[in-house]
Structure formats: C-alpha cells, structure tokens
Amino acid sequence: MKRLISCLTIICALNASAAAETTSNPCSRWISFLKPVCQRIHQTWTEGHDDMYFSGYAWHNRYVYSNEKIKSYNETAWGGGLGKSLFDEKGNWHGLYAIAFLDSHRHLEPAVGYAYLKTASVNKDLKAGLGYSVLVTSRVDYDNVPIPGALPWAALFYKRITIAATYIPGSSREGHENGNVLYMLGKISL
C-alpha cells in the first residue's frame, strides 16, 4: 500500500510540475543537449495515441536454467498497462508506458519507460521495428529499490495491434542464475 501511495504521489507531483510549465516551451529548463529528448517525450505525451498494454509470456532460456528451475518459474507473466505512442516524421515509433506484470516468482513487478523503434514498412498495414527501451522497474528480490535499465526491443505492428518482445540478459553462473528471459507483450492503440 505504501508503494502504491508513493507512486501516486510521484505521478501527481510530475503532473503538477508539467502543468506549471508554459505550453509554448515545455523544455525550457532542460540542459541544452537534453532538450531534444525532452521535446520528443513531450511530443509523444501530447500528440501520441493512447495505448493499452498486455503481457502474458516470459520464456526462460533453456540453455541457462535447469529443468527444475524452469518448473519453479512463472512463465505466464500476466499483466497490463497504459501508454502513449506515435510514429514520427520518419516513420519511427516512440512510446511511453507504465505496466505491471507477474515476474518469474509470481510477484508484481511495475515498470515505467520510454521505447524507440526504427521501423520498416512491409506494406501499408504491416511494419517491423528494432530499437531499445529505457526504463525504471522494481523487484521484490531487490528490496523494491527502483532499478534503471536499458533493453533491446523488437516489434511487429499491424494496424492498431502490436506484438513486441525484449530479451533481459543475465548471469548464467551456477547457483546465481538470473535474467536470460525473453519477455513478450502486446499493445492495442486506442
């Protein structure tokens, strides 16, 4: 409950701060070399389409984990979230998201982040993209401390539906296995 209240307080503070900024120049207080980042995030937030995310699968690499470990892990990473996204003037995709899902140990794992995908059009309705996501998450097994990260991201876009995947690298030292998970999620643009 404390975590939920903390998250809501941070979101309200960020919204109040954003509302206080002048709408004509929302990134005026940013350091000059970071202004393009701020401007793209602001554009995504203000001009982007609303998205609904859903997740349901986390594949643990069979070359890293023993059969016993695989059986003990949750691979149905049910969850969902909301986001905003847009295709820019070059046709590349930008997204902001907040999701929560069940991790490998069936604990709730929240994540917020930004994703960028360089896309190629297969036809009018179908696009493929490769890129990255920068995010902040927290996990029970790390005492719920916010953990920043960057991950590769790939996606197929078909009209308003997207199927995406990321690979979470990890360690394969015996007795200290972690990560090495292919995480799949979907998105519907509303």
From Swiss-Prot:
InterPro entries: LipidA_acyl_PagP, OMP/PagP_b-brl. Disulfide bonds: none annotated. It catalyses: a lipid A + a 1,2-diacyl-sn-glycero-3-phosphocholine = a hepta-acyl lipid A + a 2-acyl-sn-glycero-3-phosphocholine; a lipid IVA + a 1,2-diacyl-sn-glycero-3-phosphocholine = a lipid IVB + a 2-acyl-sn-glycero-3-phosphocholine; a lipid IIA + a 1,2-diacyl-sn-glycero-3-phosphocholine = a lipid IIB + a 2-acyl-sn-glycero-3-phosphocholine. One of its GO terms (cellular component) is cell outer membrane. Its EC number is 2.3.1.251. Its main location: membrane. SUPFAM superfamilies: OMPA-like. The keyword Plastid does not apply. Keywords: Acyltransferase, Cell outer membrane, Membrane, Signal, Transferase. Residues 1-18 form the signal peptide. Homodimer. Transfers a fatty acid residue from the sn-1 position of a phospholipid to the N-linked hydroxyfatty acid chain on the proximal unit of lipid A or its precursors. This is Lipid A acyltransferase PagP. It comes from Legionella pneumophila subsp. pneumophila (strain Philadelphia 1 / ATCC 33152 / DSM 7513).
